[in-house]
Amino acid sequence: MIKTVQDLINERIAVGKVVNTHGLKGEVKFFPYTNSEEIVKNLSSVVLYNREKKVFYNLSVESVRRMNKLFLIKFETIDTVEAAEKIKGCEVFIKYEELPPLQNDEYYFYEILGCEVYYESGECVGKVVDIIETGSNDVLVVKKKNRETLIPMIKDCVVEIKKPEKKIVVKELEWI
């Protein structure tokens, strides 16, 4: 079966973006979409995709090292600044199964985005359209028509997260 670029992307998750070149030997500056250093440090075989140019590359990672808030990545076969320039702007994708396993009360943002949120009574609050990282806890941005509701991801508010059903049940609190 022939796979399209869209098929390749749908089977994977974006973990960051190549934002610039670094040096003359093909290293690139990588901006991670995740706060998990483990995911970035364990990159091996990746798909790079540039949405604007509609071009993709299957590459193997040679090395990864931290540089402030970014990482420097050296890909096999990318050995010059000119070659690195060609992948600038590409998002870096890995297969979902390459993500580290989580504890029961943990989640990846992609598992929560798009979930329908309901009160315990069954009333629909809306759909999760964004997640705000506050430092102490995440906050769901739930939208229904033109109304946005902010729901903190804390035990006092969230009753249950049903990841396979893309459903979250929350307590009906006065201030929500």
Curated annotation (Swiss-Prot):
Q: Which Gene3D superfamilies does the protein's record reference?
A: PRC-barrel domain, RimM
Which keywords fit this entry according to its UniProt record? Chaperone, Cytoplasm, Ribosome biogenesis, rRNA processing
Q: Name one GO cellular component term.
A: cytoplasm
Major localization listed first in the record, in broad terms: cytoplasm
Q: Which PANTHER family match?
A: RIBOSOME MATURATION FACTOR RIMM
Q: Which family does it belong to?
A: Belongs to the RimM family.
Protein name listed in UniProt: Ribosome maturation factor RimM
Q: Give the gene name.
A: rimM
